[in-house]
Amino acid sequence: MTDTTGRIPLWMIGTLAGILVISLIGIFFYGSYSGLGSSL
């Protein structure tokens, strides 16, 4: 990657990835706590 101008900033990708991971973990633990995660 020579230049990131005009492309998605790396910090934005990291932020979105972090939010996605936290959301997936939160949903997984919430499902497990609710008893719905047993099917996973």
Swiss-Prot record:
Keyword S-adenosyl-L-methionine listed: no
Main location class: plastid
Record-annotated membrane-spanning stretches: 8-28
Keyword terms: Membrane, Photosynthesis, Photosystem II, Plastid, Reaction center, Transmembrane, Transmembrane helix
Pfam families: PsbJ
Subcellular location: Plastid membrane
GO biological process: photosynthesis
Leader sequence segment: none
One CC-aspect GO term: photosystem II reaction center
Membrane topology: Single-pass membrane protein
Assembly, per entry: PSII is composed of 1 copy each of membrane proteins PsbA, PsbB, PsbC, PsbD, PsbE, PsbF, PsbH, PsbI, PsbJ, PsbK, PsbL, PsbM, PsbT, PsbX, PsbY, PsbZ, Psb30/Ycf12, at least 3 peripheral proteins of the oxygen-evolving complex and a large number of cofactors. It forms dimeric complexes.
Family: Belongs to the PsbJ family.
The protein's role, per its UniProt record: One of the components of the core complex of photosystem II (PSII). PSII is a light-driven water:plastoquinone oxidoreductase that uses light energy to abstract electrons from H(2)O, generating O(2) and a proton gradient subsequently used for ATP formation. It consists of a core antenna complex that captures photons, and an electron transfer chain that converts photonic excitation into a charge separation.
PANTHER family per UniProt: PHOTOSYSTEM II REACTION CENTER PROTEIN J
Protein name, as recorded: Photosystem II reaction center protein J
This protein's encoding gene: psbJ
